[in-house]
Structures are given as C-alpha cells and as structure tokens.
Amino acid sequence: MSSKNEIWKNEALISALKTIEKNYGKEALVVYNEGDDIDHDVISSGSFLIDQAIGIGGYPKGRVVEIFGPESSGKTTLALHAIAEAQKQGEIAAFIDAEHSLDLNYAKKIGVDINSLLVSQPSYGEEALDILETLVKSNSISLIVVDSVAALVPKTELEGEMSDQSIGLQARMMSKALRKLNGVISKSKTTVIFINQLREKIGIMFGNPETTTGGRALKFFSTLRIEVRKGESLIENGIVVANKVKVKVVKNKVAVPFKQTLITIGYDKGIERINEIIELATLYNILDKSGVWYSYEKEKIGQGKNAVKEWLNKNPDKLSKIEFELKEFIEKS
C-alpha cells in the first residue's frame, strides 16, 4: 500500500495534481490525514429508534434521503420531526410544499418553529426543483424537505390537454435535477429529504407490484431510503389515539442496511419519544428495572411505564441527562 510520503515523491502525479488544482481549485482532489474527522455529521430524526436503525445517529448531512410509503403512513410526520431537530441546533430548515397541504398547526404541535421555517408552495415541478437548487447553493440551509415527489408535475403536463401523452416526463425531470443537485448538496452539507408515495405497477404477475413515483434516479442518488408503513391502531376509550408505524431502512450507504424498528405516532403529538426513551434506557441499563419497578441512579421511580412517564415529565433535568446518555450509547453502537 502506498503511503502519503510516496505520493509526494511521484513527480508525474504531483504535476497532475497541480493541473487539477489550477483548473478546478484546491478542494477538487484531497488526501486525508490520519487525524482527520471522517465521522458523519447528522441531523437527528427525532426518534431514538430510527436514529439507531439508521446506524449513525440520524440523517447524514450533505446527502439525499427518500422517505416513502403508502398514504397516511407517517412520512410527513417524520420529515417535520427532522425539521424540529435541525431548528433545535440553531439551523435553518425549508419545506417545499408541492402538495399544498402543509398543516402548520400540526407542525407546531410536534415542535417545529413555524416562525423560522421557510415554506414554498410551487405551482409546478420545475419551479420546485429550481427553488430547491437555489436554496442548496446558498450554503445557508441545513435541511430541505420536498413533499412530495408525486406532486412534482412537469409544467408541460400541467399546460397540456388531458388527452396529451406525458409518459416519462416526470422521470426525466427528476433525473436531470438530481444529476445537477447531487454535487452541490454534498458541498453545501445540506440534507435533502424527498417524501415519496407508492404506486401499483401495471401488469405485474410476480414479485412486488409496488413502486415509487418519479423514476429510478431518486433511488440511485439517495444515500438513505426509508420505508414507512402504518401498523396497528392504539385505542383508548373507543378512540384511536396513536398508530404503530414500521420503519425499515431499505438502502443505506453510511451504515448496515435493512435494519427496521417500530415507532408510535400519536395524533396531534407526533412520535412518542418518551416511550422510546423508556424502552432504550431500560435496554441499555440506564434505567434499572426489577419486576415492574423502575429506578434511576438508585432513586426509585415507580411501578410501570406510566409512572416513569410522569416522573420524566416532572424532572426535565433527569430527562435531558438520560437523553444524553442514550445518544452516547447509540453513537457507540
């Protein structure tokens, strides 16, 4: 294996490097040092369980992420939680609402600061993607959500007649946009989350008949592809109060793929983070459990999860400390 010292002894290579630097700048080609930080900067998903499934503690910065699934499965909720987490770190987030369906009241309830959220409601697909490109190139936005790919309708299709053929227009538009965007997204360290829907393939007799909209380009350029599916409903006093949601990482370029988890999304509350904290803190022995009794640092909390929830809500300093410990465990694992 060639060492770094041997690289600088190769005169032909040094000449090539100088030519590349002259034409394209110093950052066009680099050699990393032993002590350089190669860990991924991330934005938390807002769910400890999802952060753990992703494998690096959240959505990687400077990458494309696709969250897809059937309708009403929790896709937008996951994206809004990511926005809330970015804002907690003092970063700027944007929401490109191609569906024109963003519920600001719901976003506020799950922690989004709507007063500092940039929102665009474009009229057609090219406009949405141009806005996305401009925001990414500003190098000022940490997270951009596009909701959704299915709603990115090309201008030609919108202005044409209902009888006009428009096969492949959206796929070509997405392919061109992602080819242009991929490099600048990486350089700007912007995380771009595309929300996508599932469609039925026509005439499929064998295999999975479901596919995502927008062609194959998004599948190719995405670092993470996360599938979400609604599971059982949780009912209290005859009223549905929450849903179990299965989250599966079907593509992962930064950690081991195909990990999956089960989260709970409450109506008007979003991801039930406290339940996750109790589950994982018990798993990692941060919380001690003996039978039905829970304790923390030898302090008895009470019997059952409801007692722990109440205790955590009354002791925000202890909650913050447990969250910090959990993040350390997830990063190490």
Curated annotation (Swiss-Prot):
Q: Where in the cell is it found?
A: Cytoplasm
Q: Which UniProt keywords are given for this protein, alphabetically ordered?
A: ATP-binding, Cytoplasm, DNA damage, DNA recombination, DNA repair, DNA-binding, Nucleotide-binding, SOS response
Calcium found in the keyword field:
no
- Residues annotated to bind ATP: G69, P70, E71, S72, S73, G74, K75, T76
GO terms (molecular function) for this protein are:
ATP binding; ATP hydrolysis activity; ATP-dependent DNA damage sensor activity; damaged DNA binding; single-stranded DNA binding
What's one GO BP annotation on this UniProt entry?
Answer: DNA repair
Q: Which Pfam families match?
A: RecA, RecA_C
* Entry-linked Gene3D superfamilies: P-loop containing nucleotide triphosphate hydrolases (3.40.50.300)
Q: GO cellular-component terms in the record?
A: cytosol
Instruction: State the similarity comment.
Output: Belongs to the RecA family.
What the protein does comes down to: Can catalyze the hydrolysis of ATP in the presence of single-stranded DNA, the ATP-dependent uptake of single-stranded DNA by duplex DNA, and the ATP-dependent hybridization of homologous single-stranded DNAs. It interacts with LexA causing its activation and leading to its autocatalytic cleavage.
Under what name is this protein listed? Answer: Protein RecA
Q: What are the top taxonomic ranks of the organism?
A: Bacteria, Bacillati, Mycoplasmatota, Mollicutes, Entomoplasmatales
Encoding gene, per UniProt annotation: recA
